[in-house]
Amino acid sequence: MTAAPDATGTVNTVDAGEVAKFEAMAAEWWDLEGKFKPLHMLNPTRLDYITQQIAAEFGRDLKADAPFAGLHILDIGCGGGLLAEPMARLGADVVGADAAERNIPVAQVHAAQSGLEIDYRHTTAEAMADAGEQFDVVLNMEVVEHVVDPLGYLTACQRLLKPGGLMVCSTLNRNPKSYLMAIIGAEHVMRWLPKGTHEWSKFITPDELFDLIRQAGLDPVDRKGFVFNPLLWTWGISERDMSVNYVTASVKQV
């Protein structure tokens, strides 16, 4: 499906139904035992991948004080700020954007309570790109499977990157295992997420995502799997297993 322009002329890839799902859960973003518990469990692994990619791309020492100082980072689909806050703690100038309006005050209050300055906005990737904004890094985590036009959305993300910029994008693979784990297991058996949080038909295979990223004008440089270990009850990064959750890194040529 291709997104159509809105009244302002901006092409909007936001799916109103998907936004409504997250609006309904907005108050629970920082509840470690709430509906976002799976994301809190995954977050340290996401952060490990993100920080390593940023450090490698921009030559930063993660052991230094404020290693991301001077970097302008956009967390698109920021939710309650689970990624924006760690980026700010590492010294980055962070903008968090979300199409779900109720997420923004939740994120703002938590950042203030944490003593962090983060620019949170109720807006979309397309609107920011049309305004000419650009960033060193765009974090695009668990969003692309919720939009109506993945290519249009990724193209907006490409426009939001400065030349030489980095995009980190994670999503869910589409295969029988991901249906069993992410839909049946997470939503129906474990009840980690409300039923209907994800639509399996919107999941994207790694090869499909790489193709879309290239069509959007970026160069994919890495992809890894996020793998859950039910015995240790922890997540880890896998070089090969991208059968359910996976993450990619892409760069914009100078």
Swiss-Prot record:
Keyword S-adenosyl-L-methionine: yes
Keyword annotations from UniProtKB, A to Z: Methyltransferase, S-adenosyl-L-methionine, Transferase, Ubiquinone biosynthesis
Reaction equation(s) it catalyzes: a 3-demethylubiquinol + S-adenosyl-L-methionine = a ubiquinol + S-adenosyl-L-homocysteine + H(+); a 3-(all-trans-polyprenyl)benzene-1,2-diol + S-adenosyl-L-methionine = a 2-methoxy-6-(all-trans-polyprenyl)phenol + S-adenosyl-L-homocysteine + H(+)
InterPro entries attached to this UniProt entry: SAM-dependent_MTases_sf (IPR029063), UbiG_MeTrfase (IPR010233)
TM annotation in the entry: none
E.C. number(s) listed in UniProt: 2.1.1.222, 2.1.1.64
Family to which the UniProt record says this protein belongs: Belongs to the methyltransferase superfamily. UbiG/COQ3 family.
Name of protein: Ubiquinone biosynthesis O-methyltransferase
Source organism: Jannaschia sp. (strain CCS1)
